Structures are given as C-alpha cells and as structure tokens.
Amino acid sequence: TAWCEGFYYKPRINFELLKEHHEGLICASACLGGEVLQNLLKGDYAKAKETAQRYKDLFGDDYYIELQDHNLEDQKRTNPDLIKIAKELNIKMIITNDSHYLRREDADAQDTLLCLQTNADKDDPNRFHFPNNEFYIKSKEAMRKAFSWMDDETFEECVKNTEDAASKCNVEIELGNAPLPHYDVPEGYTNETYLQHI
C-alpha cells in the first residue's frame, strides 16, 4: 500500500494504516523530519507530547524516543524537550546516528552521489546537501563524544535501550533479489503495458 497509494518521493503510510499493521513493529520518534520533532521545531511542545503519547499508546514498550546529535542547532534545541517528553510519558530513549555513509571520510563521496541523484552542480549553494560530515556509522566512543553533554548514567541507559531495541529485530536480506512491491495487473494489460500506463 505504501508503494501504490502513499508514495510521495518515497513509500509512506498514514497513522490509520500504521494502526492496522503495527503488530511486530518497533517505532521510534525519528530524526528532525519526524512528527514529534517537527512539532517541537514549530514550538508546539504540547502537540509533540500528544504525538509521542499517541505512538506510545499504539506501540507500548516498542516505542522509543530517539535522540540524535549531529552537531546541529535544531537538535541542540530539541533534545532537552525530547528527554523531558520521554520522562513525562515514561518512554524509553535510544540514541542513534542518521547514517548515510560508512565513515566520516566518505562524506564527500556521498555529497557527489547526491549531486548525481538530484542533477545538481556541486558548487550550487542552493542544492540539497548534508550540513556537515557527521552522518556516518559511529562507534560507541564516537557516540559518547557526540553526546558529551549527556550524563554517563543516561547515556548508558540509552545505549542499553538501543541494544534492546536492536535485539528485537530479525532481518535477513537476500542478496541479488530486489524486494520489489507486488501489484496486480488489471485485465487488458501486460506487465509492460501497465507499467507504461502508470
């Protein structure tokens, strides 16, 4: 359904569809683009808290407040409110890093790929780009450095919660077989003609 009905640049679903299919899923409040953080960025703490409560009501202990620190001002501004929401609603916190490349030194290669993907010139100041080179897979030590503002006890609790959430996951990726969405081909079409039609 996300591919066929909710597609907007990427597959997505609405809350009603999520309610229908939430069993067995783990949910986190997400990055700055997530619903909770978008409300905080708009200055609406009450709406952010209400949104977090709605997800907690649906997912129970499988809902987490996700903290990130990529040295961005918006994260520095909203992380304290996320922690406050987590404490007020008794939601476990996890720490993650939005990872778009393997190592810090891969940032320039990722930037070049973004230019190719978006057909942009690298010297265009208005093109989409990541604001810094912090979007890589970080070690626990690098995460501790990023979260140096957090006390040790809270940091270790967040690490444990992150590991607990990861341990609930069971994913097997079959290489060489792209997971394409299933769709029904209406009568009167072949696979090829229906693809051309849509």
Protein language model features and the residues they cover:
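Phosphodiester-processing cores and adjacent nucleic acid-binding clamps
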Residues: T1-I198
